[in-house]
Amino acid sequence: HADARQAAVARLLADVPDSVALHHDLTTAAAGTVVRTIRDATGIVSAGEAPLVNDCACCALREDLVPELRRLADAGLTRLAVVELWDSVEPKAMAEVVATGGLRLTSVITAVDPALLLPYLADGDDLAEVGLAAAATDRRTVADTFARQLEYAPVLAVVSSEQADDEDRALLAQLHPTARRVPIDALDVTDGEGRGTDWFAPARPPATGWTPPGWEADPVHTTNAAPPHGCGSPDVATSGAGAIDGAGTTADAGAGADAPGADPAAPGAGPRSERIGSGAGGTEPRSGRTGSALVDAAFAGFDVEAAAAAQHPACALLPAEADEAGVGTLVWHRRRPFHPERLYAALEDLTCAAARSRGRFWLADRPDTLLHWDAAGGALCVESAGPWLASLPDAAWDMVPPVRRAAAALDWHPEHGDCCQHLVFTSPGLDREGLELLLESCLLTDAEYAAGPAAWKRLPPAFDSLLEV
């Protein structure tokens, strides 16, 4: 949500002396340029343009971002640089660009208005249809882009909203239960020239099933850099997809206490998370000002590799079973493969059964391939995520990351290894019983299962078109 993102950035600029926000506006990409602005708490400090790279606005952003952060670092006048990402920019991609540029990230924060959650998850429009495509070849949808922005960040800056209800807060908690949630006040933010801004904010119609109530979110990055040669380096925070400290080559890179893969007892780990609101996330007392809590979160630390592992379908930290305020999460785990034709026939019903579903699944005619399930906004993405570890020779295991081996060990079965179904469905008004019956009907029958893997591979390859074979 643009307003939520701007409120989070404004709060950081107000609470951290000598801080600036770096923002690349991609709305001018059609004219061949990307507009870059740098502002502080008083307004715009400088503005410029970056040319498109290969007709791709995000490519231009990647080319321009690190040099600008380094320029701010070298000037030695900026304590915090907030990288405010544009609406459809993926925080994961930009966080990895900053990390590989020799800069250290201190956090990734997504700013959220809970009242806009469902409208975004229900919006299956292509980004191009709403003017948010980052390139001519951009085929992403509003819903799946938003879901990734939300789920990647270990910290959610939750803007206060009179329209948000218990259902909205429960949905937020169940979609990303491990996130640290920090409350922020809704500010009267402008674009630096006195104009209020609100890009792509859908109205909130009456709720029917899980479809229209709504939400919107934007990630925030912050990176903290150690001072080079005794000079102060700016920390960099990004609103839209994470907090990036881009001032120096030794920025803080630890994982926050609630970040995936983080050890709360490890040196440099962030503070324990403070929960707000009701629902599955529970409530914990808050200490200090709202602003200081957001600043603490912005400097908590961020591990790019751990964050990537937490999103990989083979070892993703998926939500757990939950039922709160009319919102439910079903975790469906089985050790029998799907029949390809029956599953393919059920895809539309399964995709529309929940506001959000994701996980990994096992197809009988592709017994060695781990498949990724990613659905939002009534659209489903299915893709190969590589082999199941059970299909690899022992010698290849040494090349598998430890986190992947650990995830496989949790699912290990004496006969099938890590091959399994692990799908998670989250939605208001979730029909658990009907969903489970539909999923069960797609599994191999006892007779089909007993025929063995050689027979499974001869089943009709219904998913070839989806997997581009």
Regions found by a protein language model. Name each.
Residues 68, 93-97, 152, 168-171, ...:
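Alpha-helical scaffold elements adjacent to nucleotide-binding pockets in ATP/GTP-utilizing enzyme cores
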Residues 3, 7-109, 114-122, 126-139:
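Nucleotide-state-sensitive switch-loop elements of NTP-binding domains
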Residues 8-9, 94, 168, 342, ...:
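Hydrophobic side chains in well-ordered alpha-helices
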Residues 401-403, 407-469:
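Generic C-terminus detector
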Residues 81-87, 156-157, 329, 422:
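Short glycine-rich or small-residue beta-strand-to-loop segments that form or flank ligand, phosphate
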Residues 29-31, 110, 116-119, 125-248, ...:
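C-terminal accessory "lid"/substrate-recognition subdomains
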Residues 1-3, 424:
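Short, hydrophobic/glycine-enriched beta-strand segments
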